[in-house]
Amino acid sequence: MATLKEKLMTPVAAASAVPSSKITVVGVGQVGMACAVSILGKGLCDELALVDVLEDKLKGEMMDLQHGSLFLQTHKIVADKDYAVTANSKIVVVTAGVRQQEGESRLNLVQRNVGVFKGIIPQIVKYSPNCTILVVSNPVDILTYVTWKLSGLPKHRVIGSGCNLDTARFRYLMAERLGIHPTSCHGWILGEHGDSSVAVWSGVNVAGVSLQELNPAMGTDKDSENWKEVHKQVVESAYEVIRLKGYTNWAIGLSVAELCETMLKNLCRVHSVSTLVKGTYGIENDVFLSLPCVLSASGLTSVINQKLKDDEVAQLKKSADTLWSIQKDLKDM
């Protein structure tokens, strides 16, 4: 007796069992779900997998997204605490970890999160050995280093979301003061995602016009217009949002979706993301910091050799020293 489906359809060829643009999000907290929704909203993947240890919440989030499938271009959304569900992922976004508390420095989080990552990273590599891992959990630069060490993957396939969001915040705040759209204001935040990030004032421009040439004091304490306040706002913005709503999620979710889009579509766009910087700008230790990097289908394929002023290089080295002072004491690696 033929089933309804057999009466409805005549098979012609076997459907592909392997997804071509699968993305996994590890961790279904506020940040993880913002990443998932932003990725789905862009229609980037043919399959989305979610992983978490909280089974009820995980199943609930999966079902909630599945029920919206009619409005999406991703027809397959799966979830499980077993990492087998992540098999054949092109990109794995890691958002899991203990959450930052109000007023807590990102660096204070690190040792608490190392233990969490030991249960995550080897499982990712087991089921998706050819994936690129995008680390979002804070403190992101050190946890990207931890991921690189635990995964055994080449450095171009372990990337931290880094200062991509800091750069977006910077461009937004600069553009607000200038009365233009953020896409028309070009500037970069490098170094550590967080307290010791570096604003590259020498490179800020609008339509190729250097703002520091118009105002040589820009970014210094001698600036009567106090543009340095913009970078201070960038550094403090996450803490402010956490104070107001308890966490940050939407901006980082949108930032992560853009990074995934650049890699999946092989767009070769330049992003400020965390990468191994040993050997650049006189940095001697195995630390991950954000530099302008070209992302493609292969992962991180090039680093832009940005011309920095001496004080900017000094700040970058200070960022590296800040991170290394924590990293060198990490245990169970």
From Swiss-Prot:
Name by which UniProt lists this protein: L-lactate dehydrogenase B chain
Binding-site list for NAD(+): 29-57, 99, 138
Pathway: Fermentation; pyruvate fermentation to lactate; (S)-lactate from pyruvate: step 1/1
EC assignment: 1.1.1.27
Gene3D superfamilies found in the cross-reference section: Lactate dehydrogenase/glycoside hydrolase, family 4, C-terminal, NAD(P)-binding Rossmann-like Domain
Any one of the GO BP annotations: lactate metabolic process
Keyword vocabulary terms for this entry: Cytoplasm, Eye lens protein, NAD, Oxidoreductase
Subunit structure: Homotetramer.
Annotated organism of origin: Anas platyrhynchos
Subcellular location(s) of the protein: Cytoplasm
Major localization class: cytoplasm
UniProt function note: Interconverts simultaneously and stereospecifically pyruvate and lactate with concomitant interconversion of NADH and NAD(+).
Catalytic machinery residues: 193 (proton acceptor)
CDD domains per UniProt: LDH_1 (cd05293)
